[in-house]
Amino acid sequence: MAHARPKLPRINLRLDAEYPNDPRVQQLHLQILNNPNYANNVRAPLSYLVFLTAQEMYEVFVRQARGVNKKRSGGPEKPILPANPGAGPQNAPGCGGGGSGSGGSGPPGGSAPQIQPPNNGVPSNQVSSNSGSAAGSGSGSGASSNSGAGSGAGAGSSACPSSGAGSGAGAGSSAGSNVQAPPAPPPLPQVPMVPGVVNGQEMYLPLGPVNGLPQQLGTAGSDNSGGQASSPGSQNPPTKPVAPRGKLGKGR
């Protein structure tokens, strides 16, 4: 990294000629002349000269460093390597790999019984038979219009770079669609259930206020004060408040 490190720039300035003409230096001289008792009237010009030198050196250094960084960042881009180099050529996006199948050969001909497989809509020229030498058929299919079928060791190709090959009576299939399944919705929070009685039937009600039910289940008394609200988990009906006796009924 030593070659990329910028060198210390060389400043070609005649500070003895440009320093008195600098407007900031002239303002500093005026401040010193207007205030003879200025504490730094001796050290201020020298300190300001050092400040100008350091500032100019820093600006040149930053400009050179930025130029070196631009040259380094504008180089050729590195080729993007595949994550798995040994996986071979990748299929085109949206195309699934062709299926491949392999199956065992049929029994030899001669005295072996002839087994005719059921014809489920397959042409007669594609139905394998066990006469003489064994012959089979394999098929491969993909979810992105990739399909291949062959007889014996045949192979089929598709619109995508992938192909399917089958031999014997094997069959293979692959789904090559790159469409990702939608994420599952988050689970709903579990509400604790407590038993309760609604319309004479025992039901399980969630904790908290329920829509359609009164907040207080007690009846109002004579003093215009509501009864105590029963807890949601209690199955006993609320007690009826006792009306106060009149003055005339004390002796009876």
From Swiss-Prot:
This is Small capsomere-interacting protein. Residues 94-109 have a biased composition (Gly residues). Residues 69-252 are annotated as: Disordered. It comes from Alcelaphine herpesvirus 1 (strain C500) (AlHV-1). It is found in: Virion; Host nucleus. Keywords: Capsid protein, Host nucleus, Virion. Residues 213-237 have a biased composition (Polar residues). It comes from the Viruses. Interacts with the major capsid protein/MCP. Its main location: virion. GO terms for biological process: viral process. Residues 83-93 have a biased composition (Low complexity). Participates in the assembly of the infectious particles by decorating the outer surface of the capsid shell and thus forming a layer between the capsid and the tegument. Complexes composed of the major capsid protein and small capsomere-interacting protein/SCP assemble together in the host cytoplasm and are translocated to the nucleus, where they accumulate and participate in capsid assembly. Disulfide bonds: none annotated. InterPro entries: Herpes_capsid. Pfam families: Herpes_capsid. GO terms for cellular component: host cell nucleus; viral capsid.
